[in-house]
A protein has these predicted regions:
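Short loop/beta submotifs within extracellular cysteine-rich repeat domains
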Residues: 35-36, 56-58, 78, 160-162, ...
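Core segments of cupin and vicinal oxygen chelate
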Residues: 3-11, 15-55, 140-178
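N-terminal beta-strand motif that seeds the catalytic metal site of vicinal oxygen chelate
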Residues: 1-22, 66-68, 115-150, 156, ...
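Vicinal oxygen chelate
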Residues: 2-5, 10-19, 47-48, 60-135, 141, 163-165, ...
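A short beta-turn/loop motif at secondary-structure boundaries
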Residues: 40-41, 62, 94-96, 185-187, ...
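A short linear hydrophobic-aromatic micro-motif
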Residues: 35-37, 56-57, 88-92, 180-181, ...
């Protein structure tokens, strides 16, 4: 089965390092996320919040942040495949007596981790139970060269669509378990979690009533019901008016 998986396997979580998991949990729960039960594979304090589509891993340790984390059973035996794809591993922890994990970065510094197994159990929640943020759409990553980003990510199991100009210039890529996009660093210099809703203006108003602080929108994005938030862990949350 592993041989049929994309090189990185299935998307597991958007991992962030934070010194204060509790503050992050309170923030995301206020937005309508649900805690997931975590296992004991990791040695550091760890929590997971989910909106039914997206799982956010909160890690109290020192590591590249944020990280796109995937699961591929038998990842240790797949190490030669990464080398064949020209990927230089920055982490390679494999063997029978350890929790297998590899890591690498894309050409623009985005960290990627591939684990041998899940580290949480998804909560009993359906994708129709939408958080106050709307429907999770994609992770948008800064990349100065869209062609180079596409050339790196497509062999990992992603397929690029045509470059889009609205609501900001970006190159979307899809996969079975995660959609990503690339935006120019001048648009926004950090990764963003992108959410969409046909009623986003009302959602943004509700968030304002709850006292959630809004940041200036990324360059080129009009207000028009859109908004940008920042979580206590530093994650940027882009809320866009319109269907996914």
């Amino acid at each position: 089965v592993a041989a049929l998986l994309p090189l990185v396997g299935r998307f597991h979580e958007f991992s962030v390092a934070t010194p204060d998991i509790r503050a992050c949990v309170e923030f995301y729960e206020q937005l309508g996320f649900t805690q997931a039960a975590t296992g004991d594979a990791l040695s550091h304090p760890y929590g997971v919040l989910s909106d039914g589509r997206l799982h956010l891993g909160l890690h109290q340790h020192s590591a590249p942040t944020p990280t796109l984390t995937f699961v591929r059973p038998g990842v240790g035996s797949a190490v030669p495949a990464y080398a064949a794809a020209g990927i230089e591993l920055t982490v390679c922890r494999t063997g029978e007596d350890v929790f297998n994990e590899i890591g690498f970065s894309d050409p623009f510094g985005q960290a990627v981790t591939v684990l041998e197994a899940r580290t949480y159990s998804p909560p009993a929640r359906t994708a129709t139970e939408v958080s106050l943020l709307g429907d999770f759409a994609q992770v948008s990553l800064p990349a100065a060269d869209f062609a180079a980003a596409q050339a790196f990510w497509e062999p990992l199991g992603f397929v690029a669509a045509d470059e889009a100009q609205e609501p900001y210039a970006h190159l979307p890529l899809t996969s079975d378990t995660l959609d990503i996009a690339f935006h120019q660093p001048r648009t926004f210099e950090r990764p963003m979690l992108v959410f969409r809703s046909a009623a986003m203006a009302a959602r943004v108003a509700r968030l304002g009533e709850l006292g959630v602080e809004m940041l200036p929108l990324p360059r080129g994005i009009r207000a028009d019901g859109n908004a940008l938030l920042e979580a206590p862990d530093g994650t940027a949350l882009l809320l866009l008016q319109g269907e996914n």
